[in-house]
């Protein structure tokens, strides 16, 4: 079997199981990233504790690309077709409402706890919401609005592109959405000027290409195990070994090789996503049910997990309790448990379940 060989039955229920596994792993990685960020930003650069935090953070950096790949796998390969009206009447309003409500929650709660909610404060909050000044991790919802808006175009392309065109599209995205933006962020394009500097795609537009990668992989047989392992290892090395010396040199966290759609996170995402496809091919009903339950709550967990982390910090749970090698996974599990409990409560409220989570 050759790598990237198409499967004869690309659109199957088994594919959905693979996406459930991927979403479950991706939300775990999201929480690891935010837990370990306390270590990367608060410990001495290059210390043993800092390196332990960098280890966990590097391993988890495929999270956002994996979520984008899941979107591509789900929405670009529908045998029943895609309806533009449904996107604009259901998907985009869902993201918009969730974005503004949860952005408001993240702004109101700190002010409510630490200062008075005056009319002036509420006016300031409203202006910040309208200007897009939202909690940092909600940037993903901004990206998803663009991904959904472009979906009728990308879906049509996916439905009609032949093998050669598919590979060309993927190569185009790797060059302009992954490599050039990374070189630019590292300052390696400073010698150039003019319109060339506008060639690299921004993260928002590059995300659309990442959904294509998910579609490309899901409708093919799983990559060989050795290739999957190599991609994960390469991605980790780029993130860990690339960030360590750069941070030592600058005296602060140099996160260019950890962020966005840089090569390290993309290698990790592609490797873990392919691993999930392989696991999804196996008959294990119990694991499938667990993955389905966890992935169903992944959007809610993404939205609320920072609130849970702040509550945990308030009651004394942080990465400083013990070494990051242990405290990062421990706090991650606590945060996931608390966030998922919130999901189980909120999903019982019909309009909240429909529009906010």
What are these regions (language model features)?
Residues 71-75, 146, 150-157, 209-221, ...:
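Transmembrane alpha-helical segments
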Residues 1-176, 287, 319-357:
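Membrane-cytosol interface segments of multi-pass membrane proteins
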Residues 54-64, 129-143, 184-209, 240-271:
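Interfacial loop-to-helix transition and helix-capping segments at the boundaries
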Residues 164-220, 231:
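Long hydrophobic alpha-helical segments that form multi-pass transmembrane helix bundles
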Residues 7-9, 222-289:
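Alpha-helical transmembrane segments and terminal signal-anchor/GPI-anchor hydrophobic tails
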Residues 28-35, 103-104, 171-185, 233-247, ...:
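Aromatic-anchored segments of alpha-helical transmembrane domains
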Residues 247-257, 285-287, 291, 310-331:
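Extracellular/periplasmic helix-loop-helix junctions in multi-pass membrane proteins
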